[in-house]
UniProtKB/Swiss-Prot annotation:
Protein's gene: ADCYAP1
Localisation per UniProt entry: Secreted
SMART domains xrefs: GLUCA
Descriptive protein name: Pituitary adenylate cyclase-activating polypeptide
The keyword Signal appears for this protein: yes
Lineage: Eukaryota, Metazoa, Chordata, Craniata, Vertebrata
GO (cellular component) term, any one: extracellular region
InterPro entries: Glucagon_GIP_secretin_VIP, VIP/GHRH-like
Propeptide: 25-80, 173-176
Family matches, as PANTHER family: GLUCAGON-FAMILY NEUROPEPTIDE, PITUITARY ADENYLATE CYCLASE-ACTIVATING POLYPEPTIDE
Length: 176
């Protein structure tokens, strides 16, 4: 038993010595002593350590995200980035406003028809689905009408350049 614990103690001491010799040096731990200088470090005339160009990463090496961020900062100045962020924020707020207005309208419609906005358990879902399909049809039809109005307006403004002409074999080619 004492022999085993003696061997363990010797192994422990050996491990501590090896660990301290590898990781315990002042240069490895990053500690700097004024009188001790590592042999592999270069100094200028004033005694200041020079930057090691071989151990540091080159500017192009890094994660793809940081490279993309650096390229973005290089090609787009801060003023343009601020303008772009402002435009994005404005569009995002507009979309959020539309979504909240749509939700508010849905709650008003549900309250006006006597239902709950979530479509509670006592309410049957058939009128809700019918209203939903009617809304989809109305939305699609109104979008179609708007497109036709835009085409009519463009035809009136641009004249013959916008009108489609029939080519050989009946294919239609827009004239823009």
């Amino acid at each position: 038993m004492t022999m085993c614990s003696g061997a363990r103690l010797a192994l422990l001491v050996y491990g501590i010595l090896m660990h301290s010799s590898v990781y315990g040096s002042p240069a490895a731990s990053g500690l700097r002593f004024p009188g001790i200088r590592p042999e592999n470090e270069a100094y200028d005339e004033d005694g200041n350590p020079q930057q090691d160009f071989y151990d540091s990463e080159p500017p192009g090496v890094g994660s793809p995200a940081s490279a993309l961020r650096d390229a973005y900062a290089l090609y787009y100045p801060a003023e343009e980035r601020d303008v772009a962020h402002g435009i994005l924020d404005k569009a995002y707020r507009k979309v959020l406003d539309q979504l909240s207005a749509r939700r508010y309208l849905q709650t008003l419609m549900a309250k006006g028809l006597g239902g709950t906005p979530g479509g509670g358990a006592d309410d049957d879902s058939e009128p809700l689905s019918k209203r939903h399909s009617d809304g989809i049809f109305t939305d699609s039809y109104s979008r179609y009408r708007k497109q036709m109005a835009v085409k009519k307006y463009l035809a009136a403004v641009l004249g013959k350049r916008y009108k489609q002409r029939v080519k050989n074999k009946g294919r239609r080619i827009p004239y823009l």
